[in-house]
Amino acid sequence: TPLYSSAASDVYKRQTYMDKAMAIKTAMTLFEWDNETLAPREAGELTSKVIGVLSGEYFQAVTCDEMKKLLEKCRGDKSLTTAEAANVRELLEEREQICPIPQDEYQEFARLTARATSVWARAKKDQDFEAFAPTLEKVIGFQKKFAGYRAKDGKKLYDVMLDDYEKGFSMENLDRFFSVLKKQLVPFLKKVMEEGKMIEDSFLKGDYPEEKQEELGRFLAEYVGFDFDRGVMAVSAHPFTTNLHNKDVRITTHYTDCVDSSLFSVIHEAGHAIYELGIGDDLTLTPVGQGASMGMHESQSRFFENIIGRSRSFWVPIYDRVQAMFPEQLGKVNLDQFVEAVNKVTPGLIRTEADELSYSLHVLIRYEIEKMLIEEDLDVEKLPRLWADKYEEYLGVRPENPAEGVLQDIHWSQGSFGYFPSYALGSAFGAQLYYHMKEIMDFDSLLKDGRVDVIRDYLREHIHQYGKLKDSRQILKDVTGEDFNPEYYVRYLKEKYSRLYGLESKG
């Protein structure tokens, strides 16, 4: 008599293959984290070979015939739990993404992007776009080729890429979304700049010692709910979050002479991390044990950074502690002056340091350029000029060098084309969640009482714990009772900045 039934044996085999795939993916993630943080400068070339080998193992684990047979057997199996069925669905989708790509090209791309991030970091530091351009051209070439392998029924290449980050939001959907933002926010931004009151923020820039910035960052991360027993904070060229599983989530920040840059980077990345730390124990280290989508992920990071972190109520119980850390810099700056300063609208060059009102225009610029790169074969060499022209057109500023222009983001070096729109979508998702939560709890009073945990627990219960069991549209519908509606985002920005800039009485 066999020890296991045939069905039980299939479950065991499927679990074994899935565990192997997730273990390899986790190892690659760990190498990528190390590459961006602690690895020595010369490590990149050889480490990229290791990542290439691991990516080949991952490719085999997901695409092998045995895995295919097991997944096909499970497709439509009514005895599977919700989580099991979701993992089968996720692995089938992963196979659809990977199987059309030849394994040697898949591994070569993994090696390329592992090297590309180091090349980008050096080029940014040296303000030298030409040093990065050939590598970027290769990354774009691979991504277009891969999208071509995966495209079905004449689907456009950029739509294939967009689907990787936010399913169901094609160029057609995003063109409509950004059209609403452009129509409503460009004239409102102009009104704020021309008619709004003056806000002083010079005290945010100056001599803020790094060790004190780190102390403040660690305090704020913990205050909003980042668990240092299950996470670490490090320094990198570009702040990011890495998730290994719900007992190991890592964030980074960077330090400049503008204290609010690091401060809000930490709260933003803590928002990402809180999402991953909140994934259910039954889901972590499985294919669905991660955020529902990049848009939903950004909704959480930007919810913590902006809706919570830039509100006056958030600072009421803790501002005196911040002043005590920086008595010379902030001792004579009262709470209202501080809150106004960290919300000041200043159309600038750097996306990660943009105010909420102009932020979506930074994303729009990247979206338009990505469409041109992927759909119109834009020459990479023309990127710095095009970037500068668009910044001048939309925000009235022009970068003086590539580091504050086209080289400022890490995403393209990683091959993450189609990611940027999720930032603006995330802001819009977050605003819709905010208006719903205001109806069911006294949001501001909770923040004034230092009860960020109540808000965090609500998000964990209704969003975080589910991982990828639901997509972003379903989450919004289940939580708010409505389909996605970008008008909440426009309303949030207009209400907030009309109040902040004294425009309420001006119509």
Feature annotation, model-predicted:
Residues 109-261:
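Contiguous, non-catalytic segments that form substrate-binding/exosite surfaces or channel walls
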Residues 263-280, 298-302:
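Active-site recognition of the HExxH zinc-binding catalytic motif
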